[in-house]
Amino acid sequence: MNKEGKHQLVTEVHDKLQRAKAVFLADFRGMNVGQATELRNELRKAAVEFKVVKNTLLELASKGTDKEALNPYFAGPTAVAITYDDPVAAAKVLSRFAKETTNPFTLKAGVLSGKAISPADIQALADLPSREVLIAKMLGSMQAPATNFVGVLAAVPGSFVRALNAIRIQKEGN
């Protein structure tokens, strides 16, 4: 790649790193083409970009972004997974792939909210429920008091109606 191409790639990756909610680095040594394609397809479904970029170019691209915390990890074969939406979904796919493959695909590090995170932190992130599940749980928690209040309000007239009905049945029986 010539100097112009490298400059263009650095600019493109810099823009992506600035927009990203989270970035994960992995050592892809030992992956064959089939495994790489499978991983890319799974990551694409989770709206995650997966690229292999030279470490020196990654280091240049990360300058001026909150992803500079990853600079110490730019060593050896490095693949970068960039997510603009849900960091949990990306962590789930990467962690699952690292567990299921027989090759030594390993997570190196990541950055979330401008802070570097370890492979153990990435695994902890992967163990969280998905964003949709967390939102549903939160909405359920917020809705529960209102639902209970409506139930109590509905119970009072219902009890009154049942009492009147019992009195009516009692009087009809006499």
Curated annotation (Swiss-Prot):
Which keywords annotate this record?
A: Ribonucleoprotein, Ribosomal protein, RNA-binding, rRNA-binding
Q: Its domain of life?
A: Bacteria
Q: Name one GO cellular component term.
A: large ribosomal subunit
One MF annotation (Gene Ontology) recorded for this entry: structural constituent of ribosome
Keyword check for Cell wall biogenesis/degradation: no
The secretion signal range is none
* Biological process terms in GO annotation: translation
- Among its keywords, does the record have Electron transport? no
Database matches in Pfam families:
Ribosomal_L10 (PF00466)
Q: Which cysteines are joined by disulfide bonds?
A: none
Quote the CDD domains the UniProt record gives: Ribosomal_L10
Subunit structure, per the record? Answer: Part of the ribosomal stalk of the 50S ribosomal subunit. The N-terminus interacts with L11 and the large rRNA to form the base of the stalk. The C-terminus forms an elongated spine to which L12 dimers bind in a sequential fashion forming a multimeric L10(L12)X complex.
Cross-referenced PANTHER family: 39S RIBOSOMAL PROTEIN L10, MITOCHONDRIAL
Which family, according to UniProt? Belongs to the universal ribosomal protein uL10 family.
Q: What does this protein do?
A: Forms part of the ribosomal stalk, playing a central role in the interaction of the ribosome with GTP-bound translation factors.
Name listed for the protein in its UniProt record: Large ribosomal subunit protein uL10
The source organism is Geotalea daltonii (strain DSM 22248 / JCM 15807 / FRC-32) (Geobacter daltonii)
The lineage is: Bacteria, Pseudomonadati, Thermodesulfobacteriota, Desulfuromonadia, Geobacterales
